[in-house]
Amino acid sequence: MSEQKTEQKTDDQVSFAIKLSDPTFFNEAVKAINEIVEDATFSIDQDGLYFRGMDASHVALIDLISPNQDWEKWEIKNNGNFALRLDQFCKVLNSLKKKESLSLSTEGGSILHIKTPSMQMNVRTIETSSIDCPLPKISYNSLFSISGNELSRIIKQVQSVSEYIKIVTLDRLVEFSGRGDNGDVKINLEKGDPYLIEIDNRESSEAVYSLEYLQAFIKHTKSHVFTIEYSKKMPMRIETKLDHNTRVHFYLAPRVEN
């Protein structure tokens, strides 16, 4: 993937008050992001909340778009950025009661105020990062949509013998396979299978990807449907809709085999 450039800056102008009646989808998104970065700079404006970041090895990239329509309250005084240590923020989100409302606010960006019906917490933000992290511009030849729970099951099966997963798509078939010192495995899903929701091939494709990164991403969002696009030896693009309009896109570079 392309190089990622980071320029440190301090944003002391951002000011907002937003609320979710059920923060489940936001919790899932933050946990998925935390799998590839330790610190995250979020952008917020009148239209929504955004994040885009790449892991240190430049193997995986996550792009989050959460429009204001998915939030119960959306009051933005000043657009801007705010950055958090995600380990700390995830601990806060994990402590929430199931479907307990969540309010986030800040005046100036240095402190994030977190409020639920039973708790109030103030968390100091960290220095924000302005990141040049363009999305890969790729024309994909193969697309399929799959149940997240089924994809999670397939990944676990392939992980039992390999650190990588090979994906092959034909006209009506998606084949997942792995091979290692202890054996090999192959799983096929054909058009018409209830877990294979959609398949569309411009031409047959084949590529190999890291199971470590795939598993890390989907384990927090596996209750959703994944739409996967890829081409021969090209980065994979996964889209999952977490709420009515909130989407996460995950890009994963292929393993280059000799």
Regions found by a protein language model. Name each.
Residues 1-34, 39-160, 168-258:
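DNA polymerase sliding clamps and clamp-related checkpoint/processivity subunits
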Residues 165:
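Polyanion-binding surfaces on beta-sheet-dominated domains and ring/shell assemblies
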